[in-house]
Swiss-Prot record:
Enzyme class: transferase
Catalytic activity: L-histidyl-[translation elongation factor 2] + S-adenosyl-L-methionine = 2-[(3S)-amino-3-carboxypropyl]-L-histidyl-[translation elongation factor 2] + S-methyl-5'-thioadenosine + H(+)
Biased composition (Polar residues): 44-54
Enzyme Commission number(s) from the entry: 2.5.1.108
Protein's UniProt keywords contain Metal-binding: yes
Annotated binding of [4Fe-4S] cluster, by residue: 147, 251, 380
Natural source organism: Yarrowia lipolytica (strain CLIB 122 / E 150)
Function in brief: Catalyzes the first step of diphthamide biosynthesis, a post-translational modification of histidine which occurs in elongation factor 2. DPH1 and DPH2 transfer a 3-amino-3-carboxypropyl (ACP) group from S-adenosyl-L-methionine (SAM) to a histidine residue, the reaction is assisted by a reduction system comprising DPH3 and a NADH-dependent reductase, predominantly CBR1.
Protein name: 2-(3-amino-3-carboxypropyl)histidine synthase subunit 1
Keyword check for Nucleotide-binding: no
Pathway membership: Protein modification; peptidyl-diphthamide biosynthesis
Cofactor: [4Fe-4S] cluster
Gene: DPH1
Cofactor remark: Binds 1 [4Fe-4S] cluster per subunit. The cluster is coordinated with 3 cysteines and an exchangeable S-adenosyl-L-methionine.
Length: 439
């Protein structure tokens, strides 16, 4: 599944199969010398325009049908089958089609660290099958999530097309400054084992909210019917717009009710994204199924302690005179609309503000700013939630800064995780804006 430059999100049929040593791949019958798929070729195509002016011309809708000559290219399919893992869908055919039809010359590839092992392979495939004038650039900077799509760096490198792997279309395509293709890298897992595990551990009639990262989103929707028919488990995929149904991010998740759900089930490895749903829904028990280890575990989060720590930080920040406003520059993490809103409100409350741009935020770095009494960071909310205690001075999220100024509320142990929701702070909005009542 992927999002294309037309803005359509859809599934594809191309499924790569198991990898092998590149040296053992069969010889190509093509007259072009065969690469070993271990690096990128030299040379660069014409530089793309670096204009940041948004094109407002409405273009006609185009059907993105991948030509048979690409889908049925025997040499291409052999390379995919022998160099990339069979259960990871890198959508190579679609990528080649978009590059060709848009006449792109210099391609930027951006992916999280876990996929960089395949970066040079994909780079070589694109260069060989898109033509001799094509060059690629692998963007090796850290990519934490969908907020890190880095079109600005791609433009600075002279690229005219960006392929962003393993994250959903969090940053709208029409706001990105060059052509972009989001490749979700959907991963196939053993759904039979999932159904057996759930059937053994959960009672018939259990109301399950199933969530996961975008890689496992197709699996979530496949499991819904199977769990109902084979285990009697009523499974639904909650949604917070504009994310997909069942999709959860470390900073953004759906708010659920105990009247509707008995449990939250997260499909994926690690806890980072699951913790978002746990923080947003502290009264609903949470479980995690790891498709790699095939383990099902009950997960816990100390909501009381977390909220207590954040309330103390907010209270301490209230006494500040000078507040540093951090704009994250890692990809698209920072939102200038959010920054401007916060600065205006802080100044109106009598706080002196200073804006600091940082790609990554560390305690030692902020300690250098001795004249700042407290910080508000427009980058990643989880940085404050998870690591705020490690900073010498309060490090607030935009939401917490609004609570500090009595522009939002933090009641009891309820802590919202809607940063990139449709009306979230990550989009320059105020989700719980106070409405003026006419008298």
């Amino acid at each position: 599944m992927s999002c294309s430059a037309s803005g359509e999100c859809k599934s594809t049929t191309a499924t790569p199969v198991a990898p092998c040593d590149p040296d053992t791949c069969k010889k190509s019958t093509s007259t072009q010398p065969r690469k070993r798929f271990v690096g990128r070729a030299n040379g660069s195509g014409p530089s793309a325009s670096t204009s940041l002016v948004k094109n407002t011309t409405r273009r006609p809708r185009i059907i993105n049908q991948i030509p048979d000559e690409i889908l049925n290219d025997e040499e291409l399919n052999e390379v995919i089958a022998t160099t990339l893992p069979k259960n990871y869908n890198f959508e190579i055919h679609k990528s080649i089609w978009h590059i060709r039809k848009n006449n792109c010359k210099k391609i930027a590839l951006q992916m999280p660290e876990g996929l960089l092992i395949y970066a040079c392979i994909i780079s070589d495939i694109i260069e060989q099958f898109c033509g001799p004038d094509i060059s690629t650039v692998v963007m090796g900077d850290v990519t934490y999530g969908a907020c890190c799509v880095d079109d600005f760096s791609a433009i600075a490198l002279g690229c005219d097309f960006l392929i962003h792997y393993a994250h959903s279309c969090l940053v709208p395509i029409d706001s990105i400054k060059i052509k972009v293709l989001y490749v979700f890298v959907t991963i196939e897992i053993d759904t039979d084992h999932v159904v057996k595990s759930f059937k053994k551990n959960f009672e018939t009639g259990t109301r399950m909210a199933m969530v996961g990262t975008i890689q496992f989103n197709p699996t979530i929707h496949t499991l819904k019917d199977r769990l109902l028919n084979e285990a009697g488990i009523v499974c639904t995929a909650p949604q917070i717009m504009p994310l997909s149904k069942g999709e959860v991010l470390g900073c953004t998740s759906a708010n659920m009710s105990t009247e509707d759900y008995d449990m939250i089930m997260y499909i994926g490895d690690g806890r980072f994204h699951l913790e978002s749903a746990m923080i947003h829904n502290p009264d609903i028990p949470a479980y995690r199924y790891d498709p790699y280890s095939r383990k099902l575990t009950r997960e816990y989060f100390d909501q009381v302690e977390m909220v207590s720590v954040r309330k103390r930080a907010i209270q301490t920040a209230k006494n500040a005179k000078t507040i540093g406003l951090i704009l994250g520059t890692l990809g698209r993490q920072g939102n200038t609309a959010t920054l401007d809103m916060l600065q205006e409100k802080l100044n109106s409350k009598g706080y002196e503000t200073h804006i600091v741009l940082l790609s990554e935020i560390f305690p030692a770095k902020l300690a250098l700013f001795d004249g700042v009494d407290a910080w508000v960071q427009v980058a990643c909310p989880r940085l404050s939630i998870d690591w705020g205690y490690a900073f010498p001075k309060p490090l607030l999220t935009p939401y917490e800064a609004m609570v500090m100024m009595d522009e939002d509320t933090l009641e009891g142990n309820d802590y919202p995780m809607d940063y990139y929701g449709k009306e979230g702070y990550g989009r320059g909005k105020q989700p719980r804006a106070k409405k003026e009542i006419a008298i």
